[in-house]
């Protein structure tokens, strides 16, 4: 017997039981995006490798260790996208969407990073991202944070996420801070772990992200990024904080929050949760005003964020399972007897015409009434419609509530009205 071929480690199949959980969450996210005026853009999952090296930064964990990069048959270096912002900017430049224009775009789909698979973090994972181009003020930063806060309310998880906020200033301010931080860390090289030693010269701000308790203790006395902020960045951040205060958005200023991609400037933020065990990031983003020009476009202000859907689904499951569907179908249509199958199919189509959102499954494959009722239970139906030979002849249908056992017989042309009442 041939050996079974299995999915690649860290790249998962999402079975019907999984997609049933994802679909209502995705629908809620998209509805909120539409209410803020965002438009969908669909992007390739494969891009030229230089795009990510230029955008993310060559001296980052993503580029150095995590990207899936390969040569195609023409010898071109291609990469499975590890994140969505770079591709969105590339598309905006290529199609003339960004020059002297305001754009609000969103995308959703798989991303790829070669990391150690663990709960909520996989090598193929899914993100929803949103990007705003052409607006420079703190007001749009505040609005995208308010939009994410609305998501948490809609999904019923607002009490389980907290907002962390920081400003990393301009490129020049970060360069000055970088020098000060390196000078400080050099005094304690013997206390740094291997990862921090590597980052100290290549990307020292990433040392601030270290989870090593000994390094965290060292950083308590390190220079603070806020001490090096330029005046414009400080004013921008103060304006953002005032707007969030006025909107009632609770946040914590975390001066060690820097984000792992080189293109960020000024505002950076993360929504984090502790409801899945150790603290994890659910949604993160910030401002990247230099990226469009860096990738060949005209200088364009930009801000955006991305959210990991795997972790979001886990969080909704953990703290608000009532948001998720408990059954696959609402109504199961049972038919048994001579000539009942075609009548059942006609009735099913009539009901779908009358009730477009009704989840109705018709029994196929025969079987007596007992077996068909068992199938209705298996699919989680609330109501069974029963057509026997007598119902077909009389133009009626039996409507049975499976939880209570109550049933009534109505004319087939009245079935839609009754179902709408019973299902609420």
From Swiss-Prot:
Localization: Cytoplasm
tRNA-binding recorded as keyword: no
EC number of this enzyme: 6.1.1.21
Entry keyword set: Aminoacyl-tRNA synthetase, ATP-binding, Cytoplasm, Ligase, Nucleotide-binding, Protein biosynthesis
UniProt record similarity statement: Belongs to the class-II aminoacyl-tRNA synthetase family.
Subunit structure of this chain's protein: Homodimer.
Designated name of the protein: Histidine--tRNA ligase
């Amino acid at each position: 017997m041939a050996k079974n071929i299995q999915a690649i480690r860290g790249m998962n199949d999402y079975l019907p039981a999984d997609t049933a959980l994802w679909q209502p969450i995705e629908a809620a996210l998209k509805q909120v995006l539409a209410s803020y005026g965002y438009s969908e853009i669909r992007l390739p999952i494969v891009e030229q490798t230089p795009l990510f090296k230029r955008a993310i930064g060559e001296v980052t964990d993503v580029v150095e260790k995590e990207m899936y990069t390969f040569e195609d048959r023409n010898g071109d270096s291609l990469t499975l996208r590890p994140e969505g912002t770079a591709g969105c900017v590339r598309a905006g430049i290529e199609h003339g969407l960004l020059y002297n224009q305001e754009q609000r775009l969103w995308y959703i789909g798989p991303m790829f990073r070669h990391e150690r698979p663990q709960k909520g973090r996989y090598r193929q994972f899914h993100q929803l991202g949103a990007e705003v181009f052409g607006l420079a003020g703190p007001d749009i930063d505040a609005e995208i944070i308010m939009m994410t806060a609305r998501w948490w309310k809609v999904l019923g998880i607002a009490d389980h996420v907290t907002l962390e906020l920081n400003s990393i200033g301009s490129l020049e301010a970060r360069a000055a801070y970088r020098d000060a931080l390196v000078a400080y860390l050099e005094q304690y090289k013997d206390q740094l772990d291997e990862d921090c030693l590597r980052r100290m010269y290549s990307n020292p701000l990433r040392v601030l992200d270290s989870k090593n308790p000994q390094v965290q203790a060292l950083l308590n006395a390190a220079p603070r990024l806020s001490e090096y902020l330029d005046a414009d960045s400080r004013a921008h951040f103060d304006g953002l904080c005032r707007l969030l205060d006025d909107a009632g958005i609770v946040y914590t200023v975390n001066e060690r929050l820097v984000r792992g991609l080189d293109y960020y400037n000024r505002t950076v933020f993360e929504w984090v949760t502790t409801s899945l065990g150790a603290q994890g990031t659910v949604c993160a983003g910030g401002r990247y005003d230099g990226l469009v020009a860096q990738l060949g476009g005209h200088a364009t202000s930009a801000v955006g964020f991305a959210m990991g859907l795997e972790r979001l689904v886990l969080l909704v499951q953990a703290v608000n399972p009532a948001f998720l569907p408990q059954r696959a179908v609402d109504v199961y249509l049972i038919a048994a007897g001579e000539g009942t199958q075609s009548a059942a199919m006609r009735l099913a189509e009539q009901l779908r015409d009358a009730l477009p959102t009704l989840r109705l499954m018709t029994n196929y494959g025969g079987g007596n009434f007992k077996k068909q009722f068992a199938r209705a239970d298996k699919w989680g139906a609330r109501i069974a419609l029963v057509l026997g030979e007598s119902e077909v002849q009389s133009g009626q249908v039996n409507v049975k509530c499976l939880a209570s056992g109550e049933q009534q017989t109505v004319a087939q042309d009245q079935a839609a009205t009754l179902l709408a009442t019973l299902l609420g």
